[in-house]
Amino acid sequence: MGRWALDVAFVWKAALTLGLVLLYYCFSIGITFYNKWLTKSFHFPLFMTMLHLAVIFLFSALSRALVQCSSHKARVVLSWTDYLRRVAPTALATALDVGLSNWSFLYITVSLYTMTKSSAVLFILIFSLIFKLEELRAALVLVVLLIAGGLFMFTYKSTQFNVEGFALVLGASFIGGIRWTLTQILLQKADLGLQNPIDTMFHLQPLMFLGLFPLFAIFEGLHLSTSEKIFRFQDTGLLLWVLGSLLLGGILAFGLGFSEFLLVSRTSSLTLSIAGIFKEVCTLLLAAHLLGDQISLLNWLGFALCLSGISLHVALKALHSRGDGGPKPLKSLGSSADLELLLRSSQQEEEDGEEEYFVTQGQQ
């Protein structure tokens, strides 16, 4: 009887983990292909990003309100001094990372985007060393060389290479290194009370919106104001279709963050990191099959080399956590650039009842 109960518990945990991974894949891969699909007909990626930020903020505010009503505990609200001095740098870096990434979809393929964004780990490591969040070790040098070499091989003589798009997404990856380093520093400041990812998203989105607005005004403002798809529309049906498509992207973006939180809170950040590695493979295969992206043997070898560097980094983090007696929250940087805000170790017991309520609500 006891053996049977253990088998059932194992199967249930495995099924739950698989389900959460698939949910994460749906949102993560879905938003990548959504961005590419929408930018083919809607050439305003910065406006699209700003709309997504607004939707994420509204969902975050709604989630905070539901949790507060259920727990009767006030959620954290930062003072203006802390908000502008300590949160603003992270918000600005995040806005530029996301904005430039979405902008690049106007020019490059999904496969080149996926590969280049995978190199964000390279910049995260570099800035972690600069900010003394990591110690320089021979293994880290090997990780950097593998990822950099893989990126070079993937872009070398690529038939669908675009310099402008590659520069945008590489710049986004570089800023992403700053972004995740600042995020780690921000979330480790316990006095701010932003350990809960919903509170973090709630506070970041307004500053991200304001940080992205100047770029939008310069590069898209005039064109958008004269576009028949939004402000000078003549077909109400077309306007509703555009607004609905933009709303869908915001829902996918919030769902991605929420699915990451569920996966980490019910398993571990290591599970999310490993799932992120296989997600990159799935994305490239789908891009080649659905969009006709041309990937040569040399490109695949470069991608494999880059993934080996990322896998080595994840393995080193896992061994380091085990050596310290267990995983520590916010010390492990994932393999994808879209992970960091929601990384929390499931092995740290949640002290607040409202957080448990929020996770339970997300599973219904």
Curated annotation (Swiss-Prot):
GO CC list: cis-Golgi network; endoplasmic reticulum-Golgi intermediate compartment; endoplasmic reticulum-Golgi intermediate compartment membrane; nucleoplasm
Main location per the UniProt record: Golgi
Membrane-spanning ranges: 14-34, 42-62, 104-124, 136-156, 166-186, 202-222, 238-258, 272-292, 295-315
Topology class, membrane: Multi-pass membrane protein
Source domain of life: Eukaryota
Pfam families: TPT
Subcellular location: Golgi apparatus, cis-Golgi network membrane; Endoplasmic reticulum-Golgi intermediate compartment membrane
Residue ranges the record marks as coiled coil: none
Phosphoserine modification, residue list: S335, S336
InterPro entries: Sugar_P_trans_dom, TPT_transporter
Keywords, sorted A to Z: Glycoprotein, Golgi apparatus, Membrane, Phosphoprotein, Transmembrane, Transmembrane helix, Transport
GO biological process: fucosylation; negative regulation of gene expression; positive regulation of Notch signaling pathway; protein O-linked fucosylation
Positions bearing carbohydrate: N102
Family: Belongs to the TPT transporter family. SLC35C subfamily.
PANTHER family: SOLUTE CARRIER FAMILY 35
Biological role stated in the UniProt entry: May play an important role in the cellular response to tissue hypoxia. May be either a GDP-fucose transporter that competes with SLC35C1 for GDP-fucose, or a factor that otherwise enhances the fucosylation of Notch and is required for optimal Notch signaling in mammalian cells.
Annotated protein name in UniProt: Solute carrier family 35 member C2
Organism: Mus musculus (Mouse)
